[in-house]
Amino acid sequence: SEEDHAYYTFTPTVRLSYNLKKAGFLRYRFNISPAIPSLGSLTDVEQAMDTIQIVRGNPLLKTYQQFTNSLSYSYSKKQFNANLSVRHQYYDNPIMESIFVEDGKLILKDENQRSFQSLNTELMAGINGATLFGLKDFLTLYASGGYTRSWSEGLNYSHMYDEFYYSVMAQVQYKDFSLLGQFRKVQNNFFGETIKKNENQTAFMAMYT
């Protein structure tokens, strides 16, 4: 028999900002957003990934709420810019994987787990179009770094994951010629019991206009 699934969502958002005049700018944002299970996860079927792993659907999955609080402080003076941000996310009964062994097979099944939350702090600072060696608007330099701590609380597991990441970008410009270089240590994606590794990124670019 076919099953019907009906979902109703409520997505409130609150934004506050305060101008500190010469001392910078403060911004706060709070929002609640729903996460709806995919139709593929809701099917009551099994799919073999290989000879060992089986993905099992779960028609009992429920929508869960994501709560996000973010606070940022920005400051600019002449060519200098800086931004400090703090963000906390909390997922209530999120849909995350459960992994267990059954009849010699590894079963992967999505379930509404207990909770997932993360706390992130990031600082960015840089100069834009600085004069160097008597050359006007010669140098643009930005650097940023952040730290994220995540907690994953499943029905039968509990994990904590820490990560640092950073990025550096430099650009020099002389008349119609510019040269840019950038390196990014990219964050990995952690959720449930899975860490997805991302490759670091390096880029160089020369331009003439």
Model-derived features: positions:
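Residues on the lipid-exposed face of transmembrane beta-strands in outer-membrane beta-barrel proteins
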Residues: 14-18, 71-75, 86, 121-131, ...
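Surface-exposed extracellular loop regions of Gram-negative outer-membrane beta-barrel proteins
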Residues: 1-19, 22-67, 88-105, 111, 136-147, 166-189, 199-207
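Secondary-structure transition into beta-strands, especially the periplasmic turns and strand N-termini
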Residues: 18-26, 75-83, 129-141, 175-178
